[in-house]
């Protein structure tokens, strides 16, 4: 007797487990047919076996609003809405045996949540069918998200016309005509790649910024090693037609290349024109300089135009291209520091002591006018030379100006002091001719030395040397008339070795001192030469080549003038003693 009841109990439990497993298998079969949109098989299972259309089962899928995969509780209506099975969905709704607002599973999602989370091709039609069946657009899941909130997270996988239509549908507005228009105008692109959630949105974040679009979009190579949709990737791939050259590396313009339109350009990457639509419209000179005709309703995946007037980039009125934003743009507000000043092609020629072949003598009347015309410092040339050389040249102008003024004043004082000693007009003219021979005819402009001085200083030394030599020869005019004049030797007027010298050595300076002493009584003078090492120093000539910025050491001050006057007075005394 005990065995009987126990046997009946075991058999009932076994029957219940078998029936439940069979029921789960039948439900799983319905879910499979709903996902594949196999209406005939789905109807056969429902009509012949009498399966419940509102029965839920476990379905392996992605959780709504998450990237995690797992077994979730779903009804055939939810699966049909998720995969866009419009035939099965319409059949289920037409029977009226399934609740369109039923929430099941741990997520407590509805068929409308599943429809927007699936992002299927027929998503708009599925949502429209559910809304016609009185589906609630404000229903919330376990996380408090409405269908519209779920769609915002996955909208980057939807094209713009469909996205706008879905948003209007989920907001509950009267959008019947707008939905039909959006569906008709939608450009359906058949892609062999499924939607990849790992790809970043090319219109969001840094990928949608103007800086990335102009200089990095379809320029940098993609680092993904697997096959994916190139149209959804912001980087360039081997063999892609949307490839662009880096505008910072290749100086091309936004003007389309006529040779590239014909098929291929022989210049390749070195061409100065844009190759393709992307290079032309994404060029920094043209990107977002015009307003898009569709504005915020633009359906382009990558748009080259601004959707708002605030997004438009400024355009240069003279060139018609966009104004480049660079760190040097702030210099335009500062006078004298504008980048245009550095790019000037007009430069001042180097200042030379010989302007147009005329020696820069203090007696030259046009010297001052030539100097006034070159007072303006030359423009800095970044292309031809360095800034340091240009700066030194500009500084040397002021130094040469002051040097010439000093030379003019000194020359007048010497002539006033010794002008009365010249008694022979013929010898004066001969002396003037010989002095002109010592002027450099065509001095070569030397580059600045390590001290920053140029050949103009050397020319000044040569001029002073010639004057000193000519002044020494004036002693011949003081020879007594009873004695025969010595034969003039023109070679003695030059350097001792017969070569043109630009500097003054110690031996030549000592000879000049002996000639200036007026102790010459002829070529047969046997008097012992005096040692003139104690004579006043004439090294003031070297100061002409020094910088004139420091008054105490580098300028012709009162001390130099007093020394010159004392030297002239001593020569006058020696002359009187010689005559007597």
Swiss-Prot record:
Region (Disordered): 421-451
Swiss-Prot/TrEMBL induction comment: By salt stress.
Tissue: Expressed in roots and anthers.
GO cellular-component term (any): nucleus
GO molecular function: DNA binding; DNA-binding transcription factor activity; zinc ion binding
ANK repeat boundaries on the chain: 72-102, 107-139
InterPro entries assigned: Ankyrin_rpt, Ankyrin_rpt-contain_sf, Unkempt-like, Znf_CCCH
Localization, UniProt: Nucleus
UniProt keywords, alphabetically: ANK repeat, DNA-binding, Metal-binding, Nucleus, Repeat, Stress response, Zinc, Zinc-finger
Keyword DNA-binding among record annotations: yes
Zn finger spans (C3H1-type): 251-278, 286-310
GO biological process entries: cellular response to hypoxia; regulation of DNA-templated transcription
UniProt function note: Involved in salt stress response. May positively modulate plant tolerance to salt stress.
Name the record gives this protein: Zinc finger CCCH domain-containing protein 47
Annotated organism of origin: Arabidopsis thaliana (Mouse-ear cress)
């Amino acid at each position: 007797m005990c065995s009987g009841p126990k046997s009946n109990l075991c058999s009932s439990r076994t029957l219940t487990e078998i029936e439940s497993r069979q029921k789960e298998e039948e439900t799983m079969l319905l879910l499979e047919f709903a996902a594949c949109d196999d209406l005939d098989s789905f109807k056969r299972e429902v009509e012949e076996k009498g399966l419940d259309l509102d029965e839920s089962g476990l379905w392996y899928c992605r959780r709504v609003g998450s990237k995690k995969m797992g077994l979730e509780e779903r009804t055939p209506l939810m699966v049909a809405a998720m995969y866009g099975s419009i035939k099965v969905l319409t059949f289920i709704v037409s029977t009226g045996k399934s609740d369109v607002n039923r929430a099941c599973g741990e997520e407590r999602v509805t068929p409308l949540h599943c429809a927007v989370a699936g992002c299927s091709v027929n998503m708009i039609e599925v949502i429209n069918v559910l809304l016609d069946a009185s589906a609630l657009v404000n229903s919330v899941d376990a996380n408090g998200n409405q269908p519209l909130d779920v769609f915002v997270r996955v909208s980057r996988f939807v094209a713009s016309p469909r996205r706008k239509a879905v948003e209007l549908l989920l907001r509950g507005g009267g959008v019947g005509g707008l939905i039909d228009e959006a569906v008709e105008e939608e450009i359906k692109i058949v892609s062999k790649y499924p939607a990849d959630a790992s790809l970043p949105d090319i219109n969001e974040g840094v990928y949608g910024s103007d800086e990335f679009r102009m200089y990095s979009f379809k320029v940098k190579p993609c680092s993904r090693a697997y096959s994916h949709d190139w149209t959804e990737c912001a980087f360039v791939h081997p063999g892609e037609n949307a490839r662009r050259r880096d505008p910072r590396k290749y100086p091309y313009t936004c003007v389309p290349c006529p040779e590239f339109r014909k098929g291929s350009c022989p210049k390749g990457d070195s061409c100065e024109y844009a190759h393709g639509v992307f290079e032309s419209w994404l060029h920094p000179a043209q990107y977002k300089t015009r307003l898009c005709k569709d504005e915020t309703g633009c359906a382009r995946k990558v748009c080259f135009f601004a959707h708002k007037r605030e997004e438009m980039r400024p355009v240069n009125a003279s060139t018609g291209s966009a104004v480049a934003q660079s760190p040097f743009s702030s210099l335009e507000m500062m006078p004298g520091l504008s980048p245009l000043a550095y790019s000037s092609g007009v430069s001042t020629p180097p200042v030379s002591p010989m302007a147009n072949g005329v020696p820069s003598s203090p007696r030259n009347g046009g010297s001052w006018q030539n100097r006034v015309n070159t007072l303006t410092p030359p423009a800095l040339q970044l292309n031809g030379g360095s800034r340091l050389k240009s700066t030194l040249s500009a500084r040397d102008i002021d130094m040469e100006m002051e040097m010439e003024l000093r030379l003019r004043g000194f020359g007048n004082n010497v002539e006033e002091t010794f002008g009365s000693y010249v008694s022979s007009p013929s010898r004066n003219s001969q002396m003037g001719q010989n002095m002109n021979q010592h002027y450099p005819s065509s001095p070569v402009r030397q580059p600045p030395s390590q001290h920053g001085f140029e050949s103009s200083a050397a020319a000044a030394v040569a001029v002073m040397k010639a004057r000193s030599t000519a002044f020494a020869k004036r002693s011949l005019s003081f020879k007594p008339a009873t004695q025969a004049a010595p034969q003039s030797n023109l070679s003695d007027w030059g350097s001792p070795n017969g070569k043109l010298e630009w500097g003054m050595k110690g031996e030549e300076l000592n000879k000049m001192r002996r000639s200036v002493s007026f102790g010459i009584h002829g070529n047969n003078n046997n008097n012992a030469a005096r040692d003139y090492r104690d004579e006043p120093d004439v090294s003031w000539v070297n100061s002409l080549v020094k910088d004139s910025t420091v008054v105490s050491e580098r300028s012709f001050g009162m001390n130099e003038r007093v020394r010159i006057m004392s030297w002239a007075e001593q020569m006058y005394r020696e002359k009187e003693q010689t005559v007597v």
